[in-house]
Amino acid sequence: MSLPSLADFPAILLPFITRARQTWRTALTELSAEALASFEAWPEARRTAFDRVCAASDFVTEQICRDPQMLLQLAGSGELERSFSVGELRGQIADALSSAVTEDELGRNLRRQRARQQVRIIWRDLTRQADLIETCRDLSEMADASIDLAYQWLYPRHCQQFGTPTGRHCGLPQQMVILGMGKLGAVELNLSSDIDLIFAYPEGGETVGTKRALDNQEFFIRLGQRLIKALDPVTVDGFVFRVDMRLRPYGSSGALVLSFNALEQYYQDQGRDWERYAMIKARVVGGDLAAGAELLEMLRPFVYRRYLDFSAIEALRTMKQLIQQEVKRKGMAENIKLGAGGIREVEFIAQAFQLIHGGRDLSLQQRPLFNVLKTLEGQGYLPSAVTEELREGYEFLRYTEHAIQAIADRQTQMLPDNEQDQARIALIMGFADWASFHERLMYWRSRVSWHFRQVIADPDSDPDDELQDDSEVVVGGEWLPLWEESQDEDAAGRQLLQAGFVDTGKALKSLADLRSSPNLRSMQRLSRERLDAFIPRLLAQAVEHEKPDLVLERVLPLVEAVARRSAYLVLLTENPDALRQLLTLCAASPWIAEQIARFPLLLDELLNEGRLFNPPLAPELAAELRERLVRIPEDDLEQQMEALRHFKLAHSLRVAASEISGSLPLMKVSDYLTWLAEAILDQVLALAWRYSVARHGTPSRPDGTLCDPGFVIVGYGKVGGIELGHGSDLDLVFIHDGDLQTETDGAKPIDSAQFFTRLGQRVIHLLTTQTNSGQLYDVDMRLRPSGASGLLVSSLGAFARYQANEAWTWEHQALVRARVLTGSRDVGEQFEKVRADVLGRERDLDTLRAEVSEMRAKMRDNLGTRLTAAGRAANAFEASVPFDLKQDAGGIVDIEFMVQYAALAWSREHPALLQHTDNIRILEGLEEAGLLPDVDASLLREAYKAYRSAAHRQALQKQAGVVGGDQFHAQRREVMRIWAQMGLS
């Protein structure tokens, strides 16, 4: 929003200006001739500003005529025309209070400072020399300084009178913590805000140093009363801030001050939804800042739930309905804060997202509205066009609020009904007349109201109705009698049959089993109400699917799993599109249904269809994970592990959904799953490295330089070959280049070999530990030198020697698919050189063919389909027998072995074959080098992709990689033919 331009003064306001000039001149004349001369010397711009401010604000006119020296000083110091630096406003108030000896003087000096600062702030706001953010910041800083400096003045005097409060357990002096709530907490005070405060103290105990000890709570209650008295009462000097303490536990009937433990217990046991909403903006504004930070950290779990909390929308909707009823009852439709499309609706939109997602997305845990809107846009919660409209609408409403309040320094947001005040507001807002201003105001209110309804409104409600009655139609209401068993079984069966169910008896039994399950019987009333609202919607959408029986069979276990965490049911009730996606994905894949049932937090991914079916590329994946982890304290391992697991679960779901929908082909599916593993491994290694170095210090290389980390994670098998599937484990090998003869440089040094072994163990621990969100990956380390009996971590030299002198041919075959996934670049480059040297050495081809064939035969005998002699018997192509996509003849492993044989046989003459580790590109390399006929190379590539695609589909159906023997006839025969042509048996 561009700042409103200055407009010509309307005739109706000229009397205000004339009267202000006359009264001001009289006051200056009475003060001194020099004072009048000083005013006469003002530049034209300041004199115009004087007229504008006095035309708009009776309060400023009254203050400056009462104390003309105040405005002259503000003008002479240049403070009217410049922004304050950080701390400058507090410094002025501190100077003013330094001379106060009595509490009366404290109150008087605070009020005079408030009047001075208020005149300056209103002047700069009405003349648009300060933007909205600066005005709110100055007002909030004035409040912060007034509260804290008054407290700092009162506390030592209170201690002198009653003793110093001391913690019962810590034995240390206690200070009060003052929390600023609402607009004060968010640094968004308006021109005539009251201040919402909560007082607290760290722990119980009693005062020391006086004859009669006071309980700590009694001490702080009395101190709080003195602080309120210093700020709130209206005297001949005015007031500082109206103090509202009703946001404390139990409101006006509760104790004025509570201990940290009492506060935590209250919010844990009795905290209400509106109190979560209020706590979003809580900020320590005075007293013990360090203790205050600890208190806010204690209360964070109450405000921000670790799971998605769509119940917050219900709470905000209820609050809004109560506000609407009050607005209607009191005739406050013209209230720009509480009325439709007002300031509160913009705040509700932002806070709805904060309460729902803030427990998992730490970037939303902030107070200022503009910052939250920016984050909502940046994180993809709202489109930029929406956040821009909300920003502009909010600015317009807040400027209007300030114009209203500047008139008389009154806390009101009602549009005036008299022509003079209407003209004042139109002038300040830059409009020629009230009608033009009001038209623009109503435009912004309509836009805000529309966006509010999109986010907050009940999905069953009529968007044109501000207040709903009990006659509204409930989505899925026709299924409510069936769920509540208010119709007989025959009628219920007929309803299901007519809707498309096949086995109506099974469907009714499934619903009955759900109703009688232990999870549901022990549900609280609110959770049961949410379930009863959700099931009819579920049935209404299930019958839209081709196979509603299958949908119900797969989704009801999820419903039972989340029933007691009913916020998830609210999520699906509030988001019909998310429910639709859930049913579609569960119908397509029992694997997805099981994943979501085990980890309901995945429901969040269904909210954004564009994101669900568009998984990010490798750099974006890595950046997103880094951004998530950087918001978590380095010492909070539990949260880091949960964040890693949620990241993996979410992106695995997105890849599976994209594969099912057909938006991702097979090769891209494997690419994404492999990139996901690489991003996770990169961060896991970083976490393990930081932990290990913190405990033992850093190991050294043979040249004396420090390792950083001097360690690589090498991927074999599917992850090495960029062919990960759903649920694949990771074949890993760890290699380092540390000096085995030295120790680490920390306070608790250990030798380098032990350090790297522990580092490897830490990596495995982070990957495999089961948490509430499962594990990241199963890890297989058996491909390391000497297998399970070998060292967990090998030095680069030991690895090279083993591969050169001891490794079996099958280990060299495995090395064909090995590549560095993460770690030190220089160690990775040395590994690649070792790999190239080992794979590219001269080999006897007859011996190589025999060894490759022998290993393949062993695998077929042990792992293939025995009924068909691993696909080689005469019955192997019959529909009644199974075909193992991976292990049977003509399948995946045959193609992999041919590729590995070719790489070992010909890479000495054709080193380009070693550039890639995936089978498809190695086959392309064999074709380009003329080592494999074009037709055969193409056949192998297409067969390989077809097999893997079928295996992926089987995995998503939670089935083994086995299909009927009548499938893939042509591919199997061609693979077997090429196998034989290569001389393999």
From Swiss-Prot:
CDD domains: NT_GlnE_GlnD_like. The lineage of its organism: Bacteria, Pseudomonadati, Pseudomonadota, Gammaproteobacteria, Pseudomonadales. This is Bifunctional glutamine synthetase adenylyltransferase/adenylyl-removing enzyme. It is an enzyme of class 2 (transferase). GO terms for biological process: regulation of glutamine family amino acid metabolic process. Its EC number is 2.7.7.89, 2.7.7.42. Keywords: ATP-binding, Magnesium, Multifunctional enzyme, Nucleotide-binding, Nucleotidyltransferase, Transferase. Belongs to the GlnE family. It holds the Pfam family GlnD_UR_UTase. Residues 476-985 are annotated as: Adenylyl transferase. Involved in the regulation of glutamine synthetase GlnA, a key enzyme in the process to assimilate ammonia. When cellular nitrogen levels are high, the C-terminal adenylyl transferase (AT) inactivates GlnA by covalent transfer of an adenylyl group from ATP to specific tyrosine residue of GlnA, thus reducing its activity. Conversely, when nitrogen levels are low, the N-terminal adenylyl removase (AR) activates GlnA by removing the adenylyl group by phosphorolysis, increasing its activity. Its cofactor is Mg(2+). One of its GO terms (molecular function) is [glutamate-ammonia-ligase] adenylyltransferase activity. It catalyses: [glutamine synthetase]-O(4)-(5'-adenylyl)-L-tyrosine + phosphate = [glutamine synthetase]-L-tyrosine + ADP; [glutamine synthetase]-L-tyrosine + ATP = [glutamine synthetase]-O(4)-(5'-adenylyl)-L-tyrosine + diphosphate.
